[in-house]
């Protein structure tokens, strides 16, 4: 009986450790969780941070530096929505964010709708920057040269491994899009967010386009180059859109591809073999 009890205790110990790791902890104004001996930043107490004299009396834009360690654990990941303006992130006052060296991973929604960020400094240690990470963020990106996976030039943040455009900073407006193979989810949301009168010239190298690339913008006409084989659900959600030229290379128009678009006419290429559910909702 005692032997069985010890076996059960030993089996439950890892579960107890996992439960403790999953608990939210706090270090100053920062909330975090522990996984494999490393800290994941999960949130900030913005009220406490703004009450701190260091921030209260600083001239905008305030510089917010994320610590390299929390509770003695190295910060290697930042979760989703941490800097979202809709979740309490400082509003009505511009601020800059400096992420620490040693950070390896950002979440797909880390900076979603962080409307008042003016500059984000990324560390050279970053290994994972997912699509959609900087959805509708009007910030410039400061990223060291030499990262083997990512680069940022002329305001364009690119995954060099997959040749995917991840982000377009405000300074990129008016500059030709880089020769990439894919426009990632939300990658052009800032390209048009403040400039609704700009119709894009897409690179000839383009093969696929992610979701929400043309979202809630004033773009009226889009011409896709030959070589495009893939669009995504919600690639378009743009009531101003009037004209789209699809290439002969396209094979499918996925579900919800032209969501809430008021096109007057559209020619479907002969090579398209599937049109998804509600692909032209609002047509």
Give a label for each model feature:
Residues 80-82, 108-110, 131-133, 186-187, ...:
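Consensus positions within tandem repeat domains that build extended binding/scaffold surfaces
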């Amino acid at each position: 009986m005692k032997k069985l009890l010890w076996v059960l205790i030993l089996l439950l110990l890892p579960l107890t450790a996992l439960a403790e790791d999953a608990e939210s902890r706090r270090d100053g104004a920062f909330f975090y969780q522990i996984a494999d001996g490393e800290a994941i930043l999960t949130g900030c107490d913005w009220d406490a941070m703004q009450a701190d004299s260091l921030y209260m009396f600083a001239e905008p834009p305030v510089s917010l530096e994320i610590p390299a360690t929390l509770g003695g654990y190295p910060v290697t990941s930042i979760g989703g929505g941490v800097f979202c303006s809709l979740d309490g992130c400082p509003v009505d006052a511009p601020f800059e964010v400096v992420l620490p060296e040693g950070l390896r991973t950002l979440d797909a929604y880390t900076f979603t709708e962080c409307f008042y960020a003016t500059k984000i400094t990324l560390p050279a240690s970053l290994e994972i920057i997912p699509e959609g990470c900087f959805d509708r963020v009007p910030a410039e990106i400061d990223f060291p040269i030499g990262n083997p996976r990512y680069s940022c030039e002329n305001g364009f943040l690119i995954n060099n491994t997959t040749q995917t455009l991840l982000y377009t900073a405000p300074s990129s407006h008016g500059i030709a899009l880089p020769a990439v193979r894919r426009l990632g989810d939300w990658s052009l949301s800032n390209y048009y967010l403040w400039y609704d009168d700009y119709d894009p010239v897409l690179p000839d190298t383009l093969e696929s386009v992610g979701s929400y690339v043309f979202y809630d913008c004033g773009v009226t006409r889009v011409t896709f180059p030959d070589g495009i084989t893939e669009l995504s659900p919600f690639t378009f959600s743009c009531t101003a859109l009037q004209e789209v030229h699809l290439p002969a290379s396209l094979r499918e128009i996925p579900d919800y591809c032209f969501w809430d678009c008021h096109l007057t006419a559209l020619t479907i290429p002969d090579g398209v073999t599937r049109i998804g559910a509600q692909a032209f909702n609002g047509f």
